[in-house]
Amino acid sequence: MDRNSITGIVLIMGMLLGYQYFFAPKEIPAAKANVVTQKVITPKDTAKVVAIDSTVKQEQVFTLENKDIIVKLSSKGAKLVSVQLKNYKSYANFKEGKTDGLYLYNAASDEFSIELPTAAGKVKVANLDFAGVQSGNKVQFTGTLASGQSITSSYVLPEKGFLLDYQLDAKSVALTGGDYFIHWKEQVHQTEKDITEERKATINYLLSEDDEFDNLSENPSSVANENLDQSTKWISFKKKYFLSGLIPQGFAFKSAALTATPNLTDSVNIKTLDAQIIASAQDLSAGKSNFTFYFGPNDYSIVNKVEAPNFGKNVKLSYDFLLPITKYIFVPLFGFLESLFSNYGLLIV
């Protein structure tokens, strides 16, 4: 590399560092810890729980894997067991020299569950025993109620990337009422060295009206919550460097209660992100039951390609008035530099 090339690279590095220092959004100082009482949306407890098929089946665990993630699924509830990123690892594993990938979902502490209203009572899908069949990159589960009605769940993992397609087919089930209920919860674990920064994990969402993006406060020391009484096109759990997203395909969530709770005395589950979501049972009966999960890095070049309106806004590039400069100059320049240096460590957040 000649002298002019070295000089050029040094100037580019200086420009990036100067931009980061003078223009990047400053972190908001942590507020004093306080307790917020929040109202949450929960299913009514007056409905009886419907009986399920009493034939107990042995649990099976299925694995879907591509070049980027490993997904494990259980026939017990046709549910997610774990989602692991293959090419990333936590700070703890890095410090200890372990090669294990980084988990963004683990059923031991996290939850994704669906509750359906039926003529016989409410059905918690996670309580059903399913029979599973795997064919290539797809796993399909079939469960049967005591009434003989069946529910089918399927998961499809593409050959690469961080998206997981999920479908719940309940068209043969006699659903009653106008809504069904989704509960999604994640216990945020420490993946980087600075635990205070990681406690700024939050919940992002996109309102259907005018595709308006918003989020809960990124406060590391106090509870943040929001009751959304209007429809949303997607909801995501945003950490500093990683993201978990839930995107309904062809329909929108009717409402949601969102809560982010820092666990100040817990060094393992450092923050709880919780979304209690209401969706239309009529949509479900009509076959509008496809979802897409995103489990991956909070990388603009990846997140912006997800086929969901304004999903790229999960990555905070800069202040709004500087966004065009960041988006069309610095992001492409950053990508070019990364193509030259395999160990390029600068990061614009």
Where is each model-derived feature located?
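Subset of Sec-pathway N-terminal targeting signals
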Residues: M1-P43, L145
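Membrane-interface junctions
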Residues: R3, L284, S339-N343
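Active-site-proximal structural scaffolding
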Residues: G8-L11, G161, T326, F330
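Hydrophobic alpha-helical transmembrane segments of multi-pass integral membrane proteins
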Residues: L11-M15, Y166, L346-V349
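Low-complexity, proline/glycine-enriched hydrophobic segments characteristic of transmembrane helices
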Residues: A33-Q38, T46, Y294-Y300
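Short, Gly/Pro- and small/polar-rich lid/capping loops
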Residues: Q38-F62
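Soluble non-transmembrane domains of integral membrane proteins
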Residues: E65-K316
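Interfacial loop/helix-cap signal at membrane boundaries in integral membrane proteins
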Residues: Y294-Y344
